[in-house]
Amino acid sequence: MRKGIHPDYQEVVFMDSATGAKFVAGSTLKPEETIEFEGKTYPLVRVEISSDSHPFYTGKQKFAQADGRIEKFNKKYGMSSKN
């Protein structure tokens, strides 16, 4: 690898703004803010959503009921499924 062309890779703390959950991961981001986490000082990156608050990972995901929507459409526009 050529020297001087790659960004500095460092460990940073990502904090979920919605839940306050924190986790350490490697990143090339250079945030100004720092935080004390598990006895060490890390740069802090605040994120709006993470696996701790995303509905897909928390199991609170809503699924659209396609059958009900189709029936509602047919009822609204006078179409019947019995042709």
Curated annotation (Swiss-Prot):
Q: Which InterPro entries match?
A: Ribosomal_bL28/bL31-like_sf, Ribosomal_bL31, Ribosomal_bL31_B, Ribosomal_bL31_sf
Which molecular-function annotations from GO does this UniProt entry contain? Answer: structural constituent of ribosome
A Pfam family assignment: Ribosomal_L31
Keyword Ribosomal protein attached: yes
- Keywords, ordered alphabetically: Ribonucleoprotein, Ribosomal protein
Entry annotated with the keyword Ribonucleoprotein: yes
Query: PROSITE patterns from the xrefs?
Result: RIBOSOMAL_L31 (PS01143)
A GO CC term assigned to this protein in UniProt: ribonucleoprotein complex
Among Gene3D superfamilies, the record links this protein to:
Ribosomal protein L31
Q: An example of a Gene Ontology BP annotation on this entry? A: translation
**Alphabetized SUPFAM superfamilies for the sequence:** L28p-like
The family note in this entry says: Belongs to the bacterial ribosomal protein bL31 family. Type B subfamily.
User: Partners and quaternary state?
Assistant: Part of the 50S ribosomal subunit.
What is the protein name given in its UniProt record? Large ribosomal subunit protein bL31B
Q: Which organism is it from?
A: Lactobacillus johnsonii (strain CNCM I-12250 / La1 / NCC 533)
According to the entry, what is the taxonomic lineage of the organism? Bacteria, Bacillati, Bacillota, Bacilli, Lactobacillales
Q: Which gene encodes it?
A: rpmE2
